[in-house]
Amino acid sequence: MSDVVVIHTDGGCRPNPGPGGWGAVLRQRHHVREMCGGEPAQTSNNRMELTAPIMALEALTRPVSVHLYTDSTYVRNGITKWVLGWERNGWMTAAKQPVKNADLWRRLQSACARHEVEWFWVKGHSGVADNELADVLATRGLQEALAASVV
């Protein structure tokens, strides 16, 4: 796998829980793709933070090396530290409770399986250009979802 694809993602809700949006910026050499979407019904920040990398990875047309940046420690820690244990334990936490958002964790695992994904955490709202753009896209996704839901 060559030609690393760099992805920045973000997601959020207003209020949380409430309607939400997600955004992603994908870069490979000189190519840039911006993606966004949203959920006009009740969702959560964590579901939107998970949806963003899922949608970005699923949009890739062939297996590649990916550097994926998120400002969500929940997503980064979940996929790099916790998910294999949850899977081993039948999608139960150490406290024997069902894993929240297990449907999205499974989907993220599947999306990652096609690629070599290296995960990075970036501090949100700290001036990292593509993280800021992903935030703008997440807001756009929320706004578009809300606008579509009233028609």
Curated annotation (Swiss-Prot):
One GO MF term: RNA-DNA hybrid ribonuclease activity
Binding site for Mg(2+) 2: D10, D135
InterPro entries xrefs: RNase_H (IPR050092), RNaseH-like_sf (IPR012337), RNaseH_domain (IPR002156), RNaseH_sf (IPR036397), RNaseHI (IPR022892)
Keywords: Cytoplasm, Endonuclease, Hydrolase, Magnesium, Metal-binding, Nuclease
Span of domain RNase H type-1: 1-143
Cellular component, GO annotation: cytoplasm
Signal sequence coordinates: none
Cofactor note: Binds 1 Mg(2+) ion per subunit. May bind a second metal ion at a regulatory site, or after substrate binding.
CDD domains hit by this protein: RNase_HI_prokaryote_like
NCBIfam families associated with the record: PRK00203.1
Function description: Endonuclease that specifically degrades the RNA of RNA-DNA hybrids.
Subunit structure: Monomer.
Protein name, as recorded: Ribonuclease H
Organism of derivation: Mycolicibacterium gilvum (strain PYR-GCK) (Mycobacterium gilvum (strain PYR-GCK))
Gene it is expressed from: rnhA
